[in-house]
A protein has these predicted regions:
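Phosphate- and other anionic-substrate recognition elements at nucleic-acid/protein interfaces
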Residues: 1-132
């Protein structure tokens, strides 16, 4: 985000080497994200909420988030899903985000963007609105 709205919304391709969980696969994932945060003033990340479930993919995301935070060149703020969207279903969350974006912002979102990309946009918007 900048003063004009969303700069970019994109999807990072799933890394099949992740299944090996070797150090080079994890590094490749962090490097894929790091190049887009190097000039950031602030990073806002969704963290896992503890609701008793253990989801391997969610744990993987937490590991990558931890590595990104470790390399972050700026302040990092985290929110749980409960904090920023409550129990809202994915489809409703995406529809609300799209409804609230300008046509110019919508054009900056990759057409292949998944719910994860829209969650990232939603978390950023939540933080900006909370701190206005």
């Amino acid at each position: 985000f900048d003063e004009k709205g969303i700069l970019q919304g994109a999807y990072t391709v799933h890394n099949p080497d992740r299944l090996n969980r070797n150090v080079w696969a994890w590094r490749a994932m962090v490097d894929a994200v790091y190049s887009s945060i190097i000039a950031a003033d602030l990073i806002v990340i969704e963290t896992m909420q503890n609701d008793g479930r253990v989801i391997t993919d969610a744990l993987d995301v937490q590991i990558v988030c931890g590595m990104i935070i470790g390399r972050a060149p700026c302040e990092v703020i985290t929110y749980t899903p409960r904090q920023w969207k409550g129990q809202t279903p994915k489809a409703v969350t995406i529809a609300r985000i799209k409804r609230d974006l300008t046509p110019a912002e919508l054009d900056r979102i990759d057409k292949k963007a998944t719910h994860d990309a829209y969650d990232a946009i939603g978390i950023g918007r939540y933080h900006l609105n909370k701190n206005d």
